[in-house]
């Protein structure tokens, strides 16, 4: 199984720069994208643009910010994708998607940045602590 992860810093920009060609060339089974910067409402227009793949979106609550997406081969019929960790503080920013397959779980995560002035350090530490507890259970 080929799994690729990529912080794209914006869905529209990476699409125009050749995401379809990248997917065609490397043919990942799972492609995890972080920082998609598109909300779920806008994302649905893109959902059928990659033949042979399904796209699972987890956009942030505000457009132009954060979010994750999983692009999965359609032949992965036993794939289950869950958006979020069950904590609205983190889930509203679209930070985590959980892929469940018969043999393993795979987390597509966009980790928080503490910021230049460390203004979001507490948030980042809270996220990391919550994620560790989530994975341990």
Predicted regions and their residues:
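Structured beta-strand-rich core segments of catalytic domains in phosphoester-bond hydrolases
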Residues: 36-114
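Metal-dependent phosphoester/phosphodiester hydrolase catalytic core
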Residues: 114-120
């Amino acid at each position: 199984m080929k799994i690729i992860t990529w912080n794209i810093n914006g869905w529209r920009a990476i699409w125009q720069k050749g995401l379809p060609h990248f997917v065609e060339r490397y043919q990942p089974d799972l492609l995890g994208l972080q920082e998609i910067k598109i909300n779920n409402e806008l994302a649905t227009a893109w959902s059928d643009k990659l033949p042979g793949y399904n796209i699972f979106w987890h956009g942030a609550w505000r457009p132009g910010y954060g979010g994750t997406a999983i692009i999965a081969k359609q032949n992965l019929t036993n794939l289950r994708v869950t958006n979020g960790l069950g904590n609205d503080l983190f889930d509203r920013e679209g930070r985590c998607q959980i892929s469940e397959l018969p043999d393993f779980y795979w987390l597509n995560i966009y980790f928080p940045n503490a910021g230049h002035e460390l203004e979001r350090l507490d948030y980042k530490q809270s996220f990391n602590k919550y994620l560790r507890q989530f994975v341990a259970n």
